[in-house]
């Protein structure tokens, strides 16, 4: 089977995507698959470069990759692909839409407000959230242009920085707690990982540099584990995820809050999903096998 590993792309996460893609190419079972690296440099590359492949393994991150656009093109071309479909991908990429759906489904998430320009900043609403707050692009990933803002004076600059990457900016309540992540594959939760960033929060350096954060499988107390699992699976269902996804949470005073959902989690040697899979003795190669097998079973018609 010819497996095209699609990486690169045009988002701010291009370099991370290439790291993921190269890791995947090296880890795929050579006896089962012919791995074909496909590096996208511009949108137009996609249709030409996927000709002749049997399956698209997506190692893309961010816009034009994680937002449902590539999934829609592949679906139109009749090429099966890994992970969530176009709708779920688009929803999960939009942080505001994700949180609206979670709130509708009574899944706990941090409070937030949205702005599209500095003129829309409502300092009273932000005061109501309580400082510090996180300010980030609505459709960004890997914590690109994400700022932890301690005071009113720093809000405008942080919003302007986030607006360089997106037309909408989220201003979100800061929940000081323990960050955990819940990888889900085929509707089942893998071991929960704790994330202890060396910096103030799990920023882009913490995520992708060796030693940027301590990440390890954590044993939660029984009641908390049950609630985390219930929330993670409910989130996965509400957002119509398929095959695999990663639900990120914060736990404050034994109370979990859903942060966001990654429909194409990183697949570098530092990535969280492979670390979690290793907790049930699933190798990186076996994880990729499972993703391909489950993705092929999902009806894309």
Curated annotation (Swiss-Prot):
- Kindly list the GO molecular function terms attached to this UniProt entry: ATP binding; D-alanine-D-alanine ligase activity; metal ion binding
Q: Which family does it belong to?
A: Belongs to the D-alanine--D-alanine ligase family.
Q: Which residues bind ATP?
A: 126-181
List the EC numbers from the record. 6.3.2.4
Q: Name one GO biological process term.
A: regulation of cell shape
Q: What is its main location?
A: cytoplasm
The top EC class is ligase
What's the protein here called?
Answer: D-alanine--D-alanine ligase
Enumerate the subcellular locations listed in this protein's record, separating them with semicolons. Cytoplasm
Which positions does UniProt annotate for Mg(2+) 1 binding?
248, 260
Which free-text remark accompanies the cofactor? Binds 2 magnesium or manganese ions per subunit.
**ATP-grasp domain boundaries:** 99-293
**Task of the protein:** Cell wall formation.
Please give the Pfam families that the UniProt record associates with this protein: Dala_Dala_lig_C, Dala_Dala_lig_N
Required co-factor? Mg(2+); Mn(2+)
Spell out the reaction equation it catalyses.
Answer: 2 D-alanine + ATP = D-alanyl-D-alanine + ADP + phosphate + H(+)
Entry annotated with the keyword Nucleus: no
Q: Which organism is it from?
A: Clostridium perfringens (strain SM101 / Type A)
Q: In which pathway does it act?
A: Cell wall biogenesis; peptidoglycan biosynthesis
Q: Does the keyword Flavoprotein apply?
A: no
Q: Where does Mg(2+) 2 bind?
A: 260, 262
Keyword annotations from UniProtKB, A to Z = ATP-binding, Cell shape, Cell wall biogenesis/degradation, Cytoplasm, Ligase, Magnesium, Manganese, Metal-binding, Nucleotide-binding, Peptidoglycan synthesis
What domain of life does the UniProt record list for this protein's source?
A: Bacteria
């Amino acid at each position: 089977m010819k497996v095209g590993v699609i990486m690169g792309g045009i988002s701010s996460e291009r370099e991370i995507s290439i790291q993921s893609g190269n890791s995947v190419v090296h880890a795929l079972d050579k006896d089962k698959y012919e791995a074909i690296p496909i590096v996208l440099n511009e949108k137009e590359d996609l249709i030409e470069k996927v000709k002749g492949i049997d399956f698209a393994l997506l190692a893309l991150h961010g816009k034009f990759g994680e937002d449902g656009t590539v999934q829609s093109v592949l679906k139109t071309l009749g090429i099966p692909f890994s992970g969530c479909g176009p709708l779920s991908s688009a929803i999960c990429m939009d942080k505001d839409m994700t949180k609206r759906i979670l709130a509708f489904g009574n899944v706990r998430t941090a409070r937030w407000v949205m702005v599209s320009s500095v003129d829309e900043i409502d300092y009273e609403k932000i005061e109501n959230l309580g400082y510090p707050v996180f300010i980030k692009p609505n459709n960004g990933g890997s914590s690109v242009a994400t700022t932890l803002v301690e005071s009113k004076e720093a809000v405008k600059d942080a919003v302007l920085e986030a607006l360089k990457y997106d037309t909408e900016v989220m201003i979100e309540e800061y929940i000081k707690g323990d960050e955990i992540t819940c990888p889900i594959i085929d509707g089942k939760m893998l071991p929960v990982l704790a994330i202890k960033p060396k910096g103030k929060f799990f920023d882009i350096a913490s995520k992708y540099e060796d030693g940027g954060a301590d990440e390890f499988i954590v044993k939660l107390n029984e009641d908390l584990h049950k609630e985390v699992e219930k929330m993670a699976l409910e989130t996965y269902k509400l957002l119509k995820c398929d095959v695999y996804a990663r639900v990120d949470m914060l736990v404050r005073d034994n109370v979990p809050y859903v942060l966001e959902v990654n429909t194409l989690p990183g697949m570098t040697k530092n990535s969280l999903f492979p670390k979690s899979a290793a907790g049930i003795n699933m190798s990186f190669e076996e994880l990729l096998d499972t993703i391909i097998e489950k993705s092929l079973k999902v009806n894309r018609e």
